C-alpha cells in the first residue's frame, strides 16, 4: 500500500483560518484511493527530522505585526526546512507559512525579520489588508481555475528563480500589483489562499499529492479518478460569482 508521511507544522499556532482542512482533504483523497496518510503534528519544542516525511504543511497565523510567537521556528527547524526544500520534498505553505519560507518580512515600522530563505521571495507590510474571495489560474492545472479567500497585510514579491503559482483573475494575490499569486520553486506550493484551499480545488490537491508520491517512489504517478462533483460545483460557483468564467 502506498503511503505518504505528512508533517503538519505548528497546528496550534498556524491555523487561524481553518487551514488544517487541507490536511483532512489530502488524507481523505489518499484513503479514497486505497492509500495511507500518516500525519504527524510538530509544534514548539518538538524535534523535526525532515527525512521522516514526504509532505509538509504550514498554515496561516497572526501577522508579524501582531507579534506572532515563533521563536522555536528560527534555528534548527528553519535550517531543516530549507534543506528539505532543496531536497525537493513537497511543501504546501499558506499565508504566514508561505511568508516564513522567504528571505525576510519587513513590518510597517521598518523592522526586518530574517526568515528561512528557502524561497527567494520577500514580504513587506502594506497599509491596508488585502481581503476577500479571489480567483487565479495556473498553467499546471490547465483550464481549471483556483478559488480561495485572502486575508493578509503582507505584500510578497518574487525573486529570481521563483515562479508564481498562478495569475490573478480577480482579487489581489501576492501584492495587488503584478497579478502574481503564490510561488512555485522545486516542489514548494506557496499561496495566500485560505478556504480551506484544497477541498474546493481538488485538481490542485491531486497535483500536490501526485508530486509527493512521485518524489517518494521515484516514478510517474497516475492517480485514479474520484467523484469530485460536489467539490467542483463549489469551485465553479465561486468562479462564476467572481466573474471569472
What kind of feature is each model-predicted range?
Residues 2-4, 141-146, 184-189:
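Beta-strand-turn-beta hairpins that frame and shape the catalytic cleft
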Residues 63-140:
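Cysteine-nucleophile active-site neighborhood
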Residues 175-211:
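A glycine-centered loop/beta-turn motif at secondary-structure junctions
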Residues 55-59, 92, 190-192:
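Structural motif
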Residues 108-181:
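Pocket-forming structural segment of enzyme catalytic cores
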Residues 1-83, 199-245:
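N-terminal beta1-alpha1 cap of cysteine-dependent amidohydrolase-like domains
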Residues 12, 153-155, 195-197:
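Glycine-rich beta-alpha junction loops
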Amino acid at each position: 500500500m502506498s503511503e505518504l508521511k505528512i508533517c503538519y507544522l505548528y497546528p496550534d499556532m498556524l491555523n487561524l483560518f481553518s487551514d488544517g482542512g487541507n490536511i483532512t482533504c489530502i488524507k481523505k483523497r489518499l484513503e479514497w484511493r486505497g492509500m495511507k496518510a500518516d500525519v504527524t503534528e510538530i509544534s514548539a519544542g518538538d524535534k523535526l527530522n525532515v527525512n521522516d516525511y514526504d509532505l509538509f504543511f504550514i498554515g496561516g497565523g497572526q501577522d508579524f505585526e501582531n507579534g506572532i510567537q515563533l521563536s522555536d521556528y528560527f534555528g534548527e527547524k528553519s535550517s531543516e526546512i530549507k534543506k528539505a526544500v532543496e531536497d525537493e520534498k513537497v511543501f504546501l505553505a499558506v499565508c504566514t507559512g508561505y511568508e516564513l519560507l522567504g528571505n525576510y518580512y519587513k513590518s510597517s515600522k521598518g523592522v526586518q525579520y530574517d526568515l528561512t530563505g528557502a524561497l527567494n521571495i520577500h514580504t513587506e507590510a502594506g497599509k491596508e489588508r488585502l481581503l476577500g474571495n479571489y480567483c487565479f489560474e495556473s498553467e499546471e492545472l490547465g483550464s481549471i481555475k483556483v478559488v480561495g479567500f485572502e486575508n493578509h497585510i503582507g505584500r510578497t514579491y518574487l525573486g529570481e528563480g521563483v515562479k508564481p503559482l498562478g495569475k490573478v483573475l480577480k482579487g489581489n494575490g501576492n501584492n495587488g500589483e503584478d497579478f502574481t499569486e503564490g510561488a512555485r520553486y522545486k516542489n514548494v506550493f506557496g499561496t495566500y489562499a485560505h478556504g480551506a484551499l484544497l477541498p474546493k480545488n481538488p485538481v490542485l490537491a491531486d497535483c500536490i499529492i501526485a508530486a509527493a508520491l512521485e518524489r517518494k517512489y521515484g516514478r510517474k504517478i497516475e492517480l485514479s479518478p474520484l467523484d469530485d462533483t460536489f467539490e467542483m460545483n463549489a469551485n465553479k460557483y465561486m468562479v462564476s460569482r467572481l466573474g471569472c468564467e
